[in-house]
Amino acid sequence: MSDQLKIKVTRRTDFGKGAARQARRAGLIPAVVYGHGQEPVHLLLPAQETTLAVRNPNALLTVVNEAGEEHLVLPKDIQRHAIKDTVDHLDLIEVRRGEKVVVEVTVQVEGEVAPGTEYVLDYVTVPVEADATDLPEAVTISVEGREAGDHVYAPDVQVPAGATLQLEDDIVIATVNEVVEQDLGDESVQEEQAAESAEGESEGSED
């Protein structure tokens, strides 16, 4: 279920790319909090704590401002550095206890498909509605004994109590296919023919 972490924040007063770079050099992440009809609030969050917290993209955070006021927020958008993979900016959405929200949740696969087959996930994540303070980290499907041509549909997804999958029943989550083995014999013949052809061209060029 969702992590609930307290992070002390400060109000951001300087804006622009230069100010953002300066904040990051100081170990802070610029962020904006949206929600509940309020004007967006610009904050600075400690980089180390925040980066660890949002490894789970649905982490529930409690941000504590300078006045000691606490607000529950969820990551809405996480912008990362293209090379360093550090968090450059966060968009956060404020939530309340008891409020239902829809988030993308990872699909985990259990079981083994029939011999000679393999499964392909059509959905790596699925939308799930749950209490903002009790979000699942993952949902599960079973492919145990599934054979080629079988499909795992939305109703087959195992969702924790209190959560609801937000997909139509006919949506395919995973498909089981027959493993196609490459004929190495044919490949060897083709390589041999190519080698003979190259050798013939080489001899012709010497004449």
From Swiss-Prot:
One of its GO terms (molecular function) is 5S rRNA binding. Residues 182-207 are annotated as: Disordered. One of its GO terms (biological process) is translation. SUPFAM superfamilies: Ribosomal protein L25-like. GO terms for cellular component: cytosolic large ribosomal subunit. It comes from the Bacteria. This is one of the proteins that binds to the 5S RNA in the ribosome where it forms part of the central protuberance. This is Large ribosomal subunit protein bL25. It comes from Micrococcus luteus (strain ATCC 4698 / DSM 20030 / JCM 1464 / CCM 169 / CCUG 5858 / IAM 1056 / NBRC 3333 / NCIMB 9278 / NCTC 2665 / VKM Ac-2230) (Micrococcus lysodeikticus).
